[in-house]
């Protein structure tokens, strides 16, 4: 439950082994760096690297950090260098300039998962796409929401994973593509 597996990488490995042994669904995982210490991430990432994840969504804080303090961008850089799976960034994108700074610091980052930032600012995706100030009517805004929820525009982080018989399994709160 939650970040519980992060304290026991062996149990996480066993769980993922079972998941991948019993299905051919695309699986994305949202993770933190560890339960208590960022140094736990190296071992946790080694576990994730044993499996063909559709995407690894990284919130670069520990579970104990909750949402306090700064995200650990050094750990995100480590993940970019060492992850065998596609990577999605999650954490502290509250305004378009936060997304821009992330892109400048980490060129090639093209997917982010937005959480509290988009709840506080529902226009955040539009602002990140450079459409700030555009007046969208209800139909256009609904079409934008549908596009994001269906994952159009590329990348697994935008929608969800395909479940059995074409069914969508939504795994995130809200995601935007930069």
Question: What are the language-model segments listed below?
Answer:
Residues 1-178:
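Flavin-dependent oxidoreductase catalytic cores
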């Amino acid at each position: 439950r939650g970040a519980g597996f992060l304290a026991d990488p062996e149990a996480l490995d066993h769980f993922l082994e079972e998941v991948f042994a019993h299905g051919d669904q695309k699986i994305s995982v949202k993770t933190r760096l560890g339960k208590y210490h960022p140094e736990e991430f190296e071992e946790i990432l080694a576990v994730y690297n044993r499996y063909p994840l559709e995407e690894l969504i990284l919130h670069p804080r520990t579970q104990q950090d909750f949402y306090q303090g700064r995200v650990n961008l050094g750990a995100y850089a480590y993940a970019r260098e060492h992850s065998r799976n596609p990577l999605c960034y999650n954490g502290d994108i509250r305004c378009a300039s936060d997304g821009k700074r992330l892109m400048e610091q980490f060129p090639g980052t093209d997917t982010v998962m937005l959480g509290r930032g988009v709840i506080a600012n529902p226009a955040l995706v539009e602002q990140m796409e450079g459409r700030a100030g555009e007046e969208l009517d209800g139909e256009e805004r609904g079409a934008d929401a549908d596009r994001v929820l269906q994952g159009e525009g590329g990348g697994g982080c935008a929608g969800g994973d395909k479940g059995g018989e074409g069914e969508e399994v939504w795994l995130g709160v809200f995601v935007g593509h930069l």
